[in-house]
Amino acid sequence: MATQAKLYRSERPQLVPPNMWTLLTFEKRIRNDRSMTRDLSLIMPPFDGDFLWSRNLRWAAITLPEGDTRPRQFMSRFIRDPAGVRDDTGAADHPVTPGRSWETTTWQFWGEAGMPVGVEVWHDHHEPWPVEHAQFVGTTWDY
């Protein structure tokens, strides 16, 4: 049987400033085996183990100013220990059109006891832009 923590956001968008990696926060816990979720933004394994980490997110639809043809970049990544010695992994830079596509990424990496993991997002649009929907899941079969 799997041990799983799952965080979810869909009711209130999270506004993300441009050119700054921002830790996603979530609105609720869907599943919280072994009390692994922290502050509605992090999953912290209680024991070492192999984990399957997944994230699913959607940026709000974007409207560009007339004549603005500059390409935009919208990225996401998993981040270990975001408030301490930061270690990012599983970064994704998909050619997405915000609001018209979903980004789903799964990455297998070690879950260390007491080491929190989160999801960060980044964009280079000229103004803050919202993430409308996000899910973050950590799953292990090691305990």
For each feature predicted by the language model, list its residue ranges:
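Extracellular jelly-roll beta-sandwich "head" domains, especially the C-terminal globular C1q domain
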Residues: 1-143
